[in-house]
Amino acid sequence: MAGGTIWKGYIHFADTDVAVKLHAAVKAERIQFHLLHKRDHVKLHQQMICAYEKIPVPTEAQTKGFEVEEGKYIIVDPDELEQTAPESSRMIEVHEFVKTGQIDPIFLDRVYYLEPDLHSEGYSELVGALQEMGAEGICTWTMRNRSYLGALQASGKILRLNTLRYADEVISVKSLELQESPVSEKELKIGSDLINQLTTPFQPQKFENEHEKKLQKLIEKKARGEKIALLRPRLLKPTASDKLLQALEESLKKVA
């Protein structure tokens, strides 16, 4: 079930405006721990402490600064920051279209659902057109005093809005030091056969957050007063290059 409406606006392209409501498409339900005083288990609160005077600094006495060198800052006042804020808008501006699948996944960030608002005209037509053309709309919009870049996508009968990272936020693979190692035809064949044996339609419901489940069980045991046995983590070692072929063959036998 989609979350509550977090933004309302219009999709604008050419001379068309489609009224929509924005909903979160994913939820981040994680077990959260509070920081407590170890002595009496009372919840702790954070304070902003002056590094020089060692005393708490109230909010009204705080300001923001950009460090240009160690210990030297350019002070930026709230009014000055306000001037850089994007102009408030209720428009998702579609600038161009690209073929579906053309966007490298490294640029994909958070995904939202777009629901038609006020029996919006043109919504179904836009969904159908994107599917017919196999296209996604590259768009920009403003939300919560931030500017966003995104991809407008059709999925079934709905529209999705996937925020995109800007190009300067993505680290180039050229920064990595990659060492090429020779691969024999036999290793390549066995590796390909192994992948083929394990290939299946994606079923996300098959996979669960094992760490989250273990945390939940730990909390339940502690709540019942059970003693927790401490286990040492199992250390894994990478497969030696001279044993890679043997390991691949054994893996292939297990799934065959």
Swiss-Prot record:
Signal peptide: none annotated. GO terms for biological process: DNA recombination; double-strand break repair via nonhomologous end joining. CDD domains: KU_like. One of its GO terms (molecular function) is double-stranded DNA binding. InterPro entries: Ku70/Ku80_beta-barrel_dom (IPR006164), Prok_Ku (IPR009187), SPOC-like_C_dom_sf (IPR016194). Homodimer. Interacts with LigD. PANTHER family: NON-HOMOLOGOUS END JOINING PROTEIN KU. HAMAP family: Prokaryotic_Ku. Belongs to the prokaryotic Ku family. This is Non-homologous end joining protein Ku 2. The lineage of its organism: Bacteria, Pseudomonadati, Thermodesulfobacteriota, Desulfuromonadia, Geobacterales.
